[in-house]
């Protein structure tokens, strides 16, 4: 073959490969619409973003986190194994700002030609094959992929990890959002997403910045959006249906998840979830661990007061224990824990026996506590002024515990309760802490006088540098100590900081000891 024809053949082959590549991608047009989804990029995406965000100025905190994730260099991402092939996941209840946050991040990136926004209808069962076909049409210039309501996909929990790996390994940044948080958390348990952020509630700082909300209002709402439409018993029922029941129902229907309530109707599931929430709040009001309360309820050994309260609730809501089996409640508790709607707290003093549960949504805690308080009045008891303080205390505990558990969700929570000491304590990753060390490090957080100060104490305690919690011998990463309740210890953080400083000194000694042991072993090997 002559050089001329050889070069001509080579050029044709290169063009063929180029055309084949373009056909494979089909140069994703600026707008694609299908049943239950649409995809936008370029000028079409810019127009959509500008229209959606017209008049919206305030940004949620997670928007800046998305930008940091998108702008992080591939080299930086790959430096840590935990972030290889990582995506950024957002989960949250309806109307909490997921879509708005995604579009705000796209606007701040100011690179519409490099961004692709794919939106699915949550109420339509999506097809991962359709999503893959869309993603296969991306070209090298499409660096940032935003997928809204991805949890509507059938078999999402089993397939999404492998699918996302295909694209993040090519250096693309993938940001996913989904309302069905149970499916999202289940995926993250087996396939580490990289960063999974729940935005259903806001921190007090964020709520104050974005809405001007004062602390009293924050304790009532927890920073949730649109709580006005969920007031009263009917509104509370609708909130539980919208935020929890639909979440569980969609996740179970679309994914191979085994549970005892798979065949229950929506109304029956609503009743079971509502009942579970009421039991949790009752356990905190009456200072009981949950299993013990369930035992007394299901064995029929109920106190007259509790029996009347439950009877009145059942009469109004159609809830009876004959229609809700204990196994259903236990399954719901497990799923609510996976969804981060509740957090389990074990009793350190009793070798983890006697678990308590805390609802992490202050709005739910408040509404259910007030509902129960009103039914107490219906049983003939007089209204007590301390009931308001008690409800606020439960809400404060919910705020402090849920925010701590959210930021350190991979840790284990404990409380401490013996026969003499009346405390509610939250400790994370705390198996080997001696009780004398524990008692020397209590921090008082009490709502009686200054709720905002108490809350800030809890927040500051949460933000202590994890370096102080390192333990080389036992492999413990972090220690967080929060104390809720009366104590004769000095109020404030003094005792905790003293404890942490002494603990740090032990760490230094331990590290020195390990260095000496390592040196001895090396010397022995040389000999």
Residue ranges and their predicted role:
Residues 178-179, 184-295:
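Interdomain motor-coupling "hinge/lid" segment immediately C-terminal to the ATP-binding subdomain
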Residues 114-140:
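Short glycine-rich substrate-engagement loop in P-loop NTPases that contacts/grips substrate
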Residues 2-8, 18-47, 51, 346-348, ...:
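A cross-kingdom feature that marks ATP-driven nucleic-acid transaction machinery
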Residues 246-423, 427-429:
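Accessory nucleic acid-recognition modules appended to NTPase machines
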Residues 99-113:
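P-loop NTPase Walker A phosphate-binding motif
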Residues 148, 171-180:
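Structural recognition of the conserved hydrophobic beta-strand(s) that form the central parallel beta-sheet
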Residues 138-156:
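Conserved P-loop NTPase "ATPase switch" module shared by AAA+ and STAND
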Residues 83-102:
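Walker A/P-loop nucleotide-binding motif
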